[in-house]
Amino acid sequence: MKKDIHPKYEEITASCSCGNVIKIRSTVGHDLNLDVCSKCHPFFTGKQRDVATGGRVDRFNKRFNIPGSK
């Protein structure tokens, strides 16, 4: 194998917005900031959170106050 052709593979810290800190090994070279991780993602926690508060049709009906809409 050739020497000195592989990228540096070092330990970095991945910090989640929920406060969870994960140490991983990567070639990125700098620490990462994550939006979600396995500690706070709804799939892993079993908690469902309502991200979308309504579809486009609901917003249209609400904006123009169409009778028969929600």
Swiss-Prot record:
The organism's place on the tree of life at top rank: Bacteria
Cystine bridges: none
GO molecular function, one term: structural constituent of ribosome
Residue numbers bearing the N6-acetyllysine modification: K8
Keywords: Acetylation, Metal-binding, Ribonucleoprotein, Ribosomal protein, RNA-binding, rRNA-binding, Zinc
Cofactor field: Zn(2+)
Gene Ontology terms: biological process: translation
Cellular component annotations (GO), alphabetically ordered: ribonucleoprotein complex; ribosome
InterPro entries according to UniProt: Ribosomal_bL28/bL31-like_sf (IPR034704), Ribosomal_bL31 (IPR002150), Ribosomal_bL31_A (IPR027491), Ribosomal_bL31_sf (IPR042105)
Coiled-coil annotated spans: none
Short name of any one Pfam family annotated for the protein: Ribosomal_L31
Residues annotated for Zn(2+) binding in this entry: C16, C18, C37, C40
PROSITE patterns: RIBOSOMAL_L31
Cofactor: binding details: Binds 1 zinc ion per subunit.
Cleaved signal peptide residues: none
Similarity comment: Belongs to the bacterial ribosomal protein bL31 family. Type A subfamily.
Assembly with partners or alone: Part of the 50S ribosomal subunit.
Role played: Binds the 23S rRNA.
Protein name: Large ribosomal subunit protein bL31
